[in-house]
């Protein structure tokens, strides 16, 4: 599918294409998410899609710019229901909060750790510190991918839930703790298999 607009998630790069029949750039869809949300807004029931999607800057032994994505939506499901739904598709899983994973592996609280603390935990040299700068979420992503996820069991799933609100993407913040998002990711070993969240439907919060 082609769109005149790129995806709004800052963590995802849209693949740009051009057509002689259309002024300006077009973008291949990164997921069927926005079309499916239109269907939900039009009162469709539970829905799913299995489709080819495209993402730029996703090239390596674990990522390709084109891949097949399963995406589904359940009405009136909370975060726990969505986690159970995802896990039942694959296998049994260990569920851990994002903050607890950091505390367990690094003895760092992701909500309060300083950039200095995180760079020390990453054994970051001066070049890496300069490259990442002072963006907290970039440091947290580095910690997750290089220090925490490699500790996950390789023979079962690990579900990490309640990511920081700054990494909510299109998820709502947790009703009982606004510092975290109702969002999760599923890993086997250190490889992410999927993710999910409770939709943000509050227009004021989304703005």
Residue ranges and their predicted role:
Residues 96-100:
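C-terminal domain-boundary segment and adjacent tail
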Residues 78, 82-95:
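Acidic, low-complexity central loop/insert segments
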Residues 1-42, 46-81, 106-207:
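A translation/RNA-centric and nucleic-acid-associated enzymatic feature enriched
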